[in-house]
Structure formats: C-alpha cells, structure tokens
C-alpha cells in the first residue's frame, strides 16, 4: 500500500469524501500496474498522492456540477480519473491515443466501477465533432500555444478549458494569447487552487470560450 502522510490524508478526505476508498484503490493501480506498464515512473510512487492525485483532484473546485468534462491526453488518468472519483456528478470522456494506456485506463475504470467515464482511443484533433464538452482538462500535454488548438475545439463553441500548469503559466498565456483569441477564447487567467489544503497548491490556466462573443 502506498504511504500517505497525515496532511495528505486530510486533503484527500476533504476532496474525495466518502469516495476516498476508490481514490486509494486508484493510487494502488498507479503504483503497481501503472509503473509496470510505464504510465508512471517508479520514482514517483512515494509522491503519488501529493504530486499527482491531489494535485489533479483539487481542480474539481473549478468545475460546475453536472458538467461533461473531456480530458485530453489522459495518460494515467491525471486528472480525468481523479475528477471522476471525486465528482460522480460529472461525465468524463478520457481522450488518449496510445493503445496500452487506453487498455490500462479501461481496466481501472472497470475495477473501480466508474459508470461516469468513457475512454476514447483517439487524438484530440480527431475527436472534434464526436465530443462536445462543457469543460476540457489537460495536464502535461504541451505548451499552451499548442494545447489551445487541441482543447478549445472540443467545447463546441462555448465552455471552459482548465489546464494544469506550472510556474511558467503566465508566460505561456502571453505566448498563446493570439491563438486563444482566434479560437474563441474571451478570457484567460491563472488560478491557484487548493491553497487551504495542499502544501503545494495547483496552478491552472483557465480559458473561458465563447465563439459568439466578439473580442475587441
């Protein structure tokens, strides 16, 4: 079993509530078959809770109830599966092009009994028209200048992108500003989430999209 500190447990209880056991089982999948199949590096196992699962799950605060969320480049389910566990009211579509990752994701979804998750084996750009999400999430996929083109089209003209980023978030926004506006982004901001729960809060770039709204 993966060790969890008192601080991590407190945060996990606050985020996952009565679904904490599901989160613990997910972490065990990451630590075992996830590392065996190359989805998570072995060195990451001691910090799965803080650096990965809690870092991702806390962004549920930024997502409205009942939203359809598309997670681009879902990989090991970060943040997609974290959100599905923390928020059973959400409908999750995990978009992942690599077969071995898709197989692993589906195995975990089945084992945890997550009825609010669909796993799609495809590239994000090929999912346009098949997916019409309210919110699109991503973590460690690519720079925002490229990520905007992979995420915004999945919103069907209106919605939000919530991308987990690092300290360079502001700089990435500056470089991607033109592309974001062209795609229908009307407001882009950096939001720090989980300062009251996490030792290292999560930084996200939030893009509000509305193609029908004219940008000055």
UniProtKB/Swiss-Prot annotation:
S-adenosyl-L-methionine binds at residues 73, 78, 124-125, 139. Gene3D superfamilies: Vaccinia Virus protein VP39. It comes from the Bacteria. One of its GO terms (cellular component) is cytosol. The keyword rRNA processing applies. It is found in: Cytoplasm. Its EC number is 2.1.1.-. Pfam families: GidB. Keywords: Cytoplasm, Methyltransferase, rRNA processing, S-adenosyl-L-methionine, Transferase. The keyword Methyltransferase applies. InterPro entries: rRNA_ssu_MeTfrase_G, SAM-dependent_MTases_sf. GO terms for molecular function: rRNA (guanine-N7-)-methyltransferase activity. Belongs to the methyltransferase superfamily. RNA methyltransferase RsmG family. Specifically methylates the N7 position of guanine in position 518 of 16S rRNA. This is Ribosomal RNA small subunit methyltransferase G. It comes from Arthrobacter sp. (strain FB24). The lineage of its organism: Bacteria, Bacillati, Actinomycetota, Actinomycetes, Micrococcales. The gene is rsmG.
